[in-house]
Amino acid sequence: MASIEEIAHQIIEQQMGEISRSQPEISQTALMDGTTQRIQLVPSESSVSVPQRIQIVTDPQTGQKIQIVTALDQSGASKQFILTNNDGSLPSKVILTRQDSSQGKVYLTTPDAAGVNQLFISTPDVPAQHIQILSDTQCLDQNLNKQLVELCVVCGDKASGRHYGAVTCEGCKGFFKRSIRKNLVYTCRGSKDCVINKHYRNRCQYCRLQRCIALGMKQDSVQCERKPIEVSREKSSNCAASTEKIYIRKDLRSPLAATTTFVTENKTSRTTSLLDSGMLVNIQQSGVKNESILITPNKVDACQGDLSTLANVVTSLANLNKSKELPQTNTELSIIESLSNGDSSLSELAQDDQSNSEVTRAFDTLAKALNQSENSAQGSSECVGSNSNLTDANVEIEGPLLSDAHIAFRLTMPSPMPEYLNVHYICESASRLLFLSMHWARSIPSFQSLGQENSISLVKACWNELFSLGLAQCCQVMNVETILAAFVNHLHNSMQHDKLSADKVKLVMDHIFKLQEFCNSMVKLSVDGYEYAYLKAIALFSPDHPGLENVSHIEKLQEKAYMEFQDYVTKTYPEDTYRLSRLLLRLPALRLLNAAITEELFFAGLIGNVQIDSIIPYILRMETSDYNSQIIGLTV
């Protein structure tokens, strides 16, 4: 196979032999995409009256085809060319200096140009080869002695070595590995010829993957690598299952700032405004599946896992109970044990010291919750059922229902924030909000006076309303708009790939729009902490839920919450006559939100098919000090 230097010799020799000809010559040159294009040869300088031979090269950073035209004569040690664009504009001199036969590279110097470029050349009898163009104003010998920096053949970034058969950077290496390992399917929103360079490589995953393959990255090399150990289990049909990973650019904190609401007169236009916001990059399979070890219940004792979410504290209770064969005195325990069928997983193994302390702290919390369910006779003021004797309907309610201590509602987000917003991070944030909402309810003395069964029944009936009010209150901290937009994009892609039915997508999409509209309306009303607290209390003490006992007492608690709410609004906003009415009219919208869909969106990736109702009793049994220690320990 001829080298590029030999081809250059042939080109110059043919050039000298063609000077005596009077007719232009036509040459066929193979382009990088494998097609053949007929090109009219043009002279490189005015002194030469006949056409010259040319080579076509492609700049990987711009995707632009460039002509290298032979010029001058063959005297001297160096072969000289003219580098021009396709239209012949912006010419610059290129000197073929030498070839490194060991690496199959040809080094060119362009003294007229600025910066360092990297091109590829292809001819009918020579495959694509690596050409480094070195631009410098210094002398040629000085340039050749410099250490040339290898660039990624895909995006032009600084290469870290040869990966999967091609010289690439770490970014393209990781992208190619994830794409091939997980059999990801991408879609190009353009014409499948997007520019892939250091700055725009994340804009189109389809074109980036095609470029990786075209430039020599081998899929077989990835498939031969060791894959993580995993336990087979049924894939959840939930629309936010843990096998999905939502990739969103981290620098866009408020991608929907220009979209004041999801609801417009045209449903299609509101969806398009989300999908075209430029914030959503791609949805890929979860790194949890490939970067963690899924364990079965009989391995819980042997593994020192990183219990990195509050929800895992609760779900681990089932595994702990089953592995140690603890006695079951609560029917809820048998329900939550379904978590041990494969839906509970521990994150990537952390350092031993840190893992041991976290596991110890988590298991201590779980043991306390379990002991409270087994030894209800030993209940104290910390236990929900400690005041179960105060449930008579005739008990007078003394003092205010809510104190200043119930106004504070501070959500601590997981730290550090991951580079990409993934399902695990969303579920962890949502679980913290759910725990905080339930412990807020438990801190109300009147709530504890209802007794264990009634308090659990109330929270089971209204947890979705408390959670939605918490989302609205913490929408800035949680960046709710970004999360909901990610869900919309996920549904859009799932429908395109026939993963979800149109009816299912419509049902979930309507739920998302209702939730977004509710959050937007609360932000527009500038609801303060006291108002949020009273709205939650009114939603919590709702006597119209089926299966409640002492309904009249619950009704009195709701009336008291309303009266205190009215007094506060009247004193704080005396000029806003209709403020109380506007706030109360937002509560019916919460009843329109489907609790099952909320579970799918925010929690299914973490607890699988287990319902929130099953873990509510254990959340309510956690002591406040244990809850706070989990938050502090996992955030530091």
Swiss-Prot record:
Sorted UniProt keywords: Activator, DNA-binding, Metal-binding, Nucleus, Receptor, Repressor, Transcription, Transcription regulation, Zinc, Zinc-finger
Cell location: Nucleus
The UniProt record lists the keyword Acyltransferase: no
NR LBD domain: residues covered: 382-623
GO biological process, one term: negative regulation of DNA-templated transcription
Zinc finger (NR C4-type): 152-172, 188-207
Pfam families per record: Hormone_recep, zf-C4
Stored CDD domains: NR_DBD_TR2_like (cd06967), NR_LBD_TR2_like (cd06952)
GO MF: DNA binding; DNA-binding transcription factor activity; sequence-specific DNA binding; zinc ion binding
Family: Belongs to the nuclear hormone receptor family. NR2 subfamily.
PANTHER family per record: NUCLEAR HORMONE RECEPTOR
Protein name: Nuclear receptor subfamily 2 group C member 1
Organism expressing this protein natively: Xenopus tropicalis
Gene: nr2c1
